[in-house]
Each structure stands twice: as C-alpha cells, then as structure tokens.
C-alpha cells in the first residue's frame, strides 16, 4: 500500500508542477497581450502553448506528467488601424499579438482547477498515510 500511496503522491506532484508551469505561461501571454514591436516589419508577441507528455517512472510503475514543449501559436496576428504607431505598415495597420484574453482566462481557470485537483489528491494521500500509521501503532 505504501508504494501505491507513493505513486499517487508522485503523480499528483508531477501534475501540480505541470499546471504551475502552465499558469506561468498563461500569465506571460496575458502580460504580453497588448505588446507590439517597435519597428515596421517586426513581429509582435506570439501566444505560447504548453504541451504535456506522459512519462513512465519505472521505479514507481506510474505515469507522470511532464512538460513536452512550449510552442508558439501559429494563428494570425490581429490588425489594428493606428497610422501613427512606429510599427504601422504602409496602410496604417499594426500587427497585434494573437492573444485572446477570453481564451487565456479559460486556460488559466482550467489549469487552476487541475492544480487544485492534484492538491486534493496529495491531501487525501497524506490522510491515508496518517491513518495507516495510526493503525500500526
């Protein structure tokens, strides 16, 4: 049973690490949602997307969550008419980041809920360990 609890703790901890990283990336996306380049022809900030992977921990016999990579979102930039901006093209349009605040808020909420679920799993595992130790006394 101790190995099962140890596996549960490791799985939940890896999930918490992954979701914590995801929250950092979402925060970075939100922080850069209005940033532009300072010159014509330069690209503005591109939304970052976190991809996860399952990794087998042979010692525990459990699949853990790890960050596979962080990729740039290849969707189109938004165009905003601002002919006085230094990065405006010859038609007066400025490319803005491809960050949608609503999508980022939803992504943040999902990561937060996943983080909380993993935290609850750790707390449940700790309670089970305490009860098991109590029974052995």
What do the predicted segments below correspond to?
Residues 1-137:
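Amphipathic alpha-helical polymerization modules
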């Amino acid at each position: 049973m101790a190995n099962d609890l140890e596996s549960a703790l490791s799985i939940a901890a890896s999930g918490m690490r992954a979701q914590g990283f995801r929250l950092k990336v979402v925060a970075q996306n939100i922080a850069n949602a209005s940033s532009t380049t300072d010159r014509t022809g330069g690209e503005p900030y591109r939304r970052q997307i976190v991809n996860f992977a399952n990794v087998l921990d042979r010692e525990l016999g459990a699949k853990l969550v790890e960050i596979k990579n962080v990729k740039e979102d290849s969707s189109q930039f938004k165009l905003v008419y601002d002919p006085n901006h230094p990065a405006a093209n010859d038609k007066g349009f400025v490319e803005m980041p491809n960050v949608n605040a609503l999508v980022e808020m939803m992504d943040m909420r999902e990561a937060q809920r996943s983080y909380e679920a993993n935290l609850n799993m750790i707390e449940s595992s700790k309670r089970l360990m305490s009860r098991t130790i109590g029974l052995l006394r």
